[in-house]
């Protein structure tokens, strides 16, 4: 994947504005509420039976931060995303048996959360750049499935 200097700068500028724990929690909360079947992979999280339970669940916050920390690694290693996610792809395929469609759903939720945080700053160009970033991450996470 080729990244222009403008794309790299756009990713970094947006990233600097994010509170990772908050964005991660909100994206995962949105995933679980909008696509409730995705919770089946998170039985160890306890109560995910309602919007309120999901939003206040500390394990959702913890895992959301874990997701965002991995995304941080990707942002700081844009030219090596495929390698960076290799082991995680293996784990999600071989051990966790996660449907790779869920990665796409989470990326959609993340874009929506970015829109709520950035408002008018999420211009079409900014969105396109972040959609590109997340599609590269999703492809890397889904790689083991092919």
UniProtKB/Swiss-Prot annotation:
One GO term under biological process is:
hydrogen peroxide catabolic process
Q: Which gene encodes it?
A: HBB
Entry function: Involved in oxygen transport from the lung to the various peripheral tissues.
The family line of this record is: Belongs to the globin family.
**Residue positions binding heme b:** 63, 92
Keyword flag Iron: yes
Q: What is this protein called?
A: Hemoglobin subunit beta
At the highest ranks, the source species' classification is: Eukaryota, Metazoa, Chordata, Craniata, Vertebrata
**Single GO cellular component term:** blood microparticle
Tissue distribution is: Red blood cells.
The Swiss-Prot or TrEMBL record annotates one GO molecular function as: heme binding
Report the Pfam families cross-referenced here. Answer: Globin
InterPro entries this protein is in?
A: Globin, Globin-like_sf, Globin/Proto, Hemoglobin_b, Hemoglobin_oxygen_transport
Q: Which UniProt keywords apply?
A: Heme, Iron, Metal-binding, Oxygen transport, Transport
Q: Which residues form the Globin domain?
A: 2-146
Subunit details: Heterotetramer of two alpha chains and two beta chains (an easy dimerization is also reported).
Q: Which domain of life is it from?
A: Eukaryota
């Amino acid at each position: 994947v080729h990244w222009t200097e403008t794309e790299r700068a756009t990713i970094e500028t947006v990233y600097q504005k994010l509170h990772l724990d908050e964005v991660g929690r909100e994206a995962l909360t949105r995933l679980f509420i909008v696509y409730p079947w995705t919770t089946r992979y998170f039985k160890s999280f306890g109560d995910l039976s309602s919007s309120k339970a999901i939003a206040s669940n500390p394990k959702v916050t913890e895992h959301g931060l874990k997701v965002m920390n991995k995304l941080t690694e990707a942002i700081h290693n844009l030219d090596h995303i495929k390698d960076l996610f290799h082991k995680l792809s293996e784990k999600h395929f071989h051990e966790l048996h996660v449907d790779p469609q869920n990665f796409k759903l989470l990326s959609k939720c993340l874009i929506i959360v970015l829109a709520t945080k950035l408002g008018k700053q999420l211009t079409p160009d900014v969105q396109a750049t972040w959609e590109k970033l997340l599609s590269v991450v999703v492809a890397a996470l889904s790689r083991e499935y092919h």
